[in-house]
Each structure stands twice: as structure tokens, then as C-alpha cells.
């Protein structure tokens, strides 16, 4: 079964992008490559219960089992030894990616207190968008009574766009809410 957001992309976003950017080939159209969700846990890396809780929460949110990221080298100042777990990461592609983005846009982001939209300055110059979430409680799958600690996470939306302007228009047409107080068109990128 095709995801709702993917169907919206094919039916509404593709014709809009064809008209706006005047593509000559269907392969020039921007698309979502992947979504990467990363959750680092710094000083709590010595606690195995914290690692298990983070893996459980992220697997519930992403509907996919995350991998444990480990330190490449020892850093004495941060009390990190080589191969010590320092975070968890999950990469979403295909139908799972569209399902997660649909839940993020329509269920999770509106639950953030005083949410004005995402900051459009978080583009990296190559058409990819990165932002952070302070707590996992905004996702409806996470129950407040069953968490041991509030965790934040970084979400990276990787697109095939070549410029930030193209990516902003693409992600806006998908429904991602951007902050309208500081307009993108007035700034030079």
C-alpha cells in the first residue's frame, strides 16, 4: 500500500515542481533520499539501562531497530574509551521514511509547545535539512509513564535537491512547516 505522503508527492508536488522550476526531464525532479535520526547521549554512555531505553524509544518512533554508534578513539577529557557506545542512529528509506515524515509533520510537530515552525536556516547548502527535537514525548507512540528519561534527537532530511531554495520549496510543498517570521526570500543564500 502506498503511503499517504508519497501519494501526495506524486499527485500534487511533482506537477507543482515541474511548473515552478521548469525541469526538462523527470529525473531532475527532487525527491527524498533518506531520513537519518540520531540520538547521542554523552555522559550517560556508561549506563547500560540508558542505552537500552534509548534503543527502545527510537525503535518505537522510527518503526525500525537503530544501530549503536561507538567512539572511534579514546578522549580522556570526555571520559570516553575506544568503542564505547556514544549514541544510536537509524536511517529510514522508502515507505518507512514516508510514514515517519507523515507522522512527524501531522502529529509530532504540532504537539510542540509554542511551535512557530522550523527554522529554514538549518539547510546545509546542498539541499539537505537538519533540525533537532528536545524531547521524544511529542511522538504519540511514546507514553509518558513508560520513559525513564527525556531524550532529544537530531533529524536530517536528505534530498536530491542541489540548492537550498529548491529544497525549501520542495519541503514546503510536502507540508513541512517553516517559520514564516523571517522570510527565506529576503535573505541571500
From Swiss-Prot:
According to its UniProt record, where is this protein located? Plastid, Chloroplast
Instruction: Tell me which SUPFAM superfamilies the record gives.
Output: RL5-like (SSF55282)
Q: Does the keyword Ligase apply?
A: no
Main localization (coarse) = plastid
**Record GO terms (molecular function):** rRNA binding; structural constituent of ribosome
Gene Ontology cellular-component terms for this entry are: chloroplast; ribonucleoprotein complex; ribosome
What InterPro entries does the record tag this protein with?
A: Ribosomal_uL5 (IPR002132), Ribosomal_uL5_bac-type (IPR020930), Ribosomal_uL5_C (IPR031309), Ribosomal_uL5_dom_sf (IPR022803), Ribosomal_uL5_N (IPR031310)
Protein known as: Large ribosomal subunit protein uL5c
Q: Which gene encodes it?
A: rpl5
Amino acid at each position: 500500500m502506498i503511503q499517504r505522503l508519497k501519494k501526495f508527492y506524486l499527485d500534487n508536488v511533482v506537477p507543482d515542481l515541474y511548473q515552478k522550476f521548469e525541469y526538462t526531464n523527470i529525473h531532475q525532479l527532487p525527491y527524498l533520499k533518506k531520513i537519518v535520526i540520531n540520538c547521542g547521549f554523552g555522559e550517560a554512555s556508561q549506563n547500560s539501562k540508558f542505552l537500552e531505553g534509548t534503543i527502545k524509544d527510537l525503535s518505537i518512533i522510527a518503526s525500525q531497530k537503530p544501530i549503536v554508534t561507538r567512539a572511534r578513539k579514546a578522549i580522556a577529557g570526555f571520559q570516553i574509551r575506544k568503542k564505547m557506545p556514544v549514541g544510536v542512529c537509524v536511517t529510514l528509506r522508502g515507505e518507512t521514511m514516508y510514514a515517519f515524515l507523515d507522522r512527524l509533520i501531522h502529529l509530532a510537530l504540532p504537539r510542540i509547545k509554542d511551535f512557530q515552525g522550523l527554522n529554514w536556516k538549518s539547510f546545509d547548502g546542498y539541499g539537505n535539512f537538519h533540525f533537532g527535537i528536545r524531547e521524544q514525548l511529542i511522538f504519540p507512540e511514546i507514553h509518558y509513564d513508560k520513559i525513564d528519561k527525556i531524550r532529544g534527537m537530531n533529524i536530517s532530511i536528505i534530498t536530491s535537491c542541489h540548492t537550498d531554495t529548491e529544497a525549501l520549496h520542495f519541503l514546503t510543498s510536502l507540508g513541512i512547516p517553516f517559520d514564516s517570521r523571517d522570510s527565506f526570500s529576503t535573505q541571500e543564500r
